[in-house]
């Protein structure tokens, strides 16, 4: 039943709305993903490595505190475009360590630990901390997750949406904009409750799905969503089962295995990034409809293919829009076929 879940969300929203956010007292200490961060004042120069953190800061009216961005999957939301156009993009993907520190940041906000972490493509947290530059890693990518196992890490427990609310609250505290953070979290919780209600009346007892992010080459095993990750949370919240059983965040699974599972829906990522051929969702669609293995899947034959922005599959503000889009799409399908 989804109704208890809705009640819990509404209760959390009401309690949050009643609480009065207190201003930040500096010096501030924040415990973050195994590191202790210290702030003498609200950061005035921030570099973001990851679109999720960038758009969180924009949503709280902190765009003027951002001096450099990087790691983009989709174009920035239209409502943030004017602000984003004023800020240097250090890289579409991972920036160099030198380009980040060259912006003289007082904070580096990081979406993914494989960017800044023990084996970080940009550097380690210690490298930044030795220069007195704190690094804030979004909790969704470190809590109950081992990023040293599997290409994109392995979930030790199912993703918890509370980690997104925690990111918003902690960033709001760091920048002393707690009321903005509280308001944003209340909006996110209300959006989630609405999406769950949309799917409530649909008979989805045996419905299943596969989420295809990308592929290094079109003719090899695709990167798909594991069963404890963020897309799995999105599906299960709406009463849909993920056909992938791996604990890895984005494991590769063969199309023969996927076809045998024959998911009710296929969810594919749309992105503006062009690192891999399958980053282009139109190439994904063409492959699904032409490959002799995939074209006979029920989801392909009955056109039950849902297209979501890649960032809607990440622990980001866009995930809530993604859940709403999923709920609306699923609600519109005739599952009697």
Predicted regions and their residues:
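Bacterial N-terminal signal peptides
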Residues: 7-17
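Bacterial Sec-exported substrate-binding components of ABC uptake systems
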Residues: 19-55, 157, 173-212, 330-337
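Short helix-initiation/N-cap motifs at beta->coil->alpha
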Residues: 32-34, 88-98, 141, 247-255
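A short, structured surface patch at a secondary-structure boundary
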Residues: 45-118
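Structured C-terminal subdomain patch of bacterial secreted/periplasmic proteins
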Residues: 158-167, 268-337
């Amino acid at each position: 039943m989804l109704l208890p879940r809705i009640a819990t969300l509404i209760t959390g929203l009401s309690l949050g709305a009643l609480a009065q956010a207190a201003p930040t007292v500096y010096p501030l200490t924040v415990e973050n993903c195994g590191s202790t961060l210290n702030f003498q004042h609200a950061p005035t120069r921030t570099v973001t490595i990851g679109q999720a953190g960038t758009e969180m800061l924009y949503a709280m009216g902190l765009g003027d505190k951002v001096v450099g961005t990087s790691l983009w999957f989709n174009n920035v939301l239209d409502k943030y475009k004017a602000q984003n156009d004023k800020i240097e993009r250090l890289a579409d993907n991972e920036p160099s360590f030198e380009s980040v520190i060259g912006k003289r940041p007082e904070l580096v906000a990081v979406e993914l630990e494989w960017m800044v972490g023990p084996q970080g493509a940009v550097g380690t947290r210690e490298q930044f901390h030795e220069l007195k530059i704190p690094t804030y890693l979004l909790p969704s990518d470190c809590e109950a997750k081992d990023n040293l196992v599997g290409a994109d890490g392995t979930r030790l427990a199912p993703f918890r949406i509370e980690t997104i609310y925690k990111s918003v609250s902690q960033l709001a505290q760091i920048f002393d904009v707690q009321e903005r953070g509280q308001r944003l979290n209340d909006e996110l919780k209300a959006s989630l409750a609405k999406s769950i209600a949309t799917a409530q009346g649909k008979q989805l007892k045996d419905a299943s799905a596969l989420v295809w992010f990308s592929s290094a080459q079109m003719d090899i095993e695709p990167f798909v969503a594991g069963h404890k990750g963020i897309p799995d949370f999105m599906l299960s919240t709406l009463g849909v089962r993920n056909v992938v059983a791996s604990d890895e965040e984005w494991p590769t699974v063969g199309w023969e295995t996927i076809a045998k599972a024959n998911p009710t829906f296929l969810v594919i990522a749309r992105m503006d990034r062009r690192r891999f051929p399958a980053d282009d969702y139109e190439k994904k669609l063409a492959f699904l409809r032409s490959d002799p293995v995939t074209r006979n899947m029920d989801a392909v034959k009955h056109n039950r293919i849902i297209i979501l922005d890649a960032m809607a599959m990440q622990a980001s503000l866009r995930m809530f829009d993604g859940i709403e889009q999923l709920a609306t799409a699923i609600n519109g399908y005739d599952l009697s076929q």
